[in-house]
Amino acid sequence: MPEFILYLLLIAAFIFSIFTSINVKGTFRKYNKMPSSRGMSAADIARQILDSNGLYNVQVTRVSGELTDHYDPRTNTVALSAPVYDSVSVGAIGVAAHEVGHAIQYAENYTPIRIRMAILPVAQFGSSAWILFFILGIVFNMPILRGIGIGLFAAIVLFQLITLPVEFNASHRALATIKNQGILFGAEYTAAKKTLTAAAMTYVASLAVALLQLLRLIASSRRD
């Protein structure tokens, strides 16, 4: 692939990444103003879904920030951000159900989760070390160091690639549960789906940027 095309694709991916980041915040804020007919808070919905799956030991807690919601397998906790925890909106319920989906994945030993956890230590090390190895390889003209740097960056890309099915599956579980348990219907369900789709696209954008950066590193290494 010609290098100028690679750079054009990388610029396009960066723009797409910025768009998805803005879009997910806008979509969440829009549907966080749309109350559900059930009138239950996102935290209560999360608790209900956890209990219906026998996950009584998983706690639901509040964390600061916006869109900082996550599941922490170390503490077995579904952490919901301040705008989500007490909200009765369809957007908040979608986010909460998604995080519960991650808790269910861990409980069921979902295969992509196990693969991602196995890669995590290398990806964490690589996120801070790859650039050091790559630069040292250039400075000292040592291809092996550049190769190590590229390999570590490839581990980051692989981690992001494995993250995609994890996130999409969590959203699928969330939407299926929301429908099957009669939590949201009609326009409310559609709004929750749009919220989760917008969030999922941020992972697609991040992977696209990382993959193109990896190709650029490989191309520059071969050129040198």
Question: What feature does the model see in each segment?
Answer:
Residues 10, 124-127, 131, 150-153:
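Residues within membrane-spanning alpha-helices of integral membrane proteins
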Residues 1-27, 137, 143-144, 148, ...:
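Hydrophobic alpha-helical transmembrane segments of small proteolipidic membrane proteins, enriched
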Residues 132, 147, 207-211:
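A hydrophobic membrane-anchoring feature enriched in long, contiguous, low-charge segments
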Residues 120-142:
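Post-HExxH zinc-binding segment in Zn-dependent metallohydrolases
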Residues 1-2, 41, 126, 142:
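Serine/threonine-rich low-complexity intrinsically disordered regions
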Residues 21-123, 127, 158-224:
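Polar-ligand-bearing catalytic/cofactor-coordination segments
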